[in-house]
């Protein structure tokens, strides 16, 4: 699929395809759509990042609040987005011991109490042990530092989800 295909998508098609690149934030995809034409996948990714960077802190916190707790109730209930479910499975968060699940639950609650948004990390770039260590460490960050760190993680997730979309296109086409 050439980049022209993405450029020629109408609003609904574009939001349908890219609406969860930023977890549960189709409005970001809607805003990015207005910046067509895209010259490359990298340019499209940059537009997602630029949109987020221009948000005030409250907007960035809103994006973070759309993310589920890692190994939380949405995973247990099966109500995660398909992307989040795959990411948490890949990180091993479905194979926690009782002690790990309890520890992660307590850390998630403490983190949310401190920062007022869930802990966000690119699960696909980490495993369950690293995620628990990062959560244990990052809970001590300043609110400003943690907001910036969490948004950087959202951008990593965005990058991988855009690559997933690219990898679903027919072979022999290019962006």
Residue ranges and their predicted role:
Residues 3-8, 20, 27-107, 157-175:
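Aromatic-anchored, charged helix-turn/loop surface patch used as a conserved interaction hotspot
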Residues 14:
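Surface-exposed, charge/polar-rich loops and edge strands
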Residues 96-100, 104-169:
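C-terminal non-catalytic interaction appendages of large macromolecular assemblies
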């Amino acid at each position: 699929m050439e980049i022209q295909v993405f450029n020629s998508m109408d609003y609904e098609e574009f939001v349908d395809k890219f609406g969860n690149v930023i977890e549960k934030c189709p409005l970001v995809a809607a805003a990015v759509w207005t910046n067509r034409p895209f010259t490359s996948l990298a340019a499209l990714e940059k537009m997602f990042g630029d949109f987020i960077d221009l948000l005030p802190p409250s907007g960035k916190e809103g994006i973070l609040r759309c993310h589920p707790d890692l190994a939380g109730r949405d995973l247990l209930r099966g109500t995660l987005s398909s992307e989040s479910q795959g990411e948490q499975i890949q990180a091993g968060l479905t194979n926690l011991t009782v002690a790990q699940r309890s520890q992660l639950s307590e850390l998630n609650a403490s983190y949310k109490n401190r920062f007022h948004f869930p802990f966000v990390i690119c699960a696909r770039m980490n495993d369950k042990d690293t995620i628990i260590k990062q959560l244990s460490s990052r809970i001590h960050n300043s609110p400003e530092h943690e907001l910036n760190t969490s948004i950087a993680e959202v951008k990593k997730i965005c990058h991988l989800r855009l690559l997933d979309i690219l990898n679903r296109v027919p072979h022999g086409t290019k962006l």
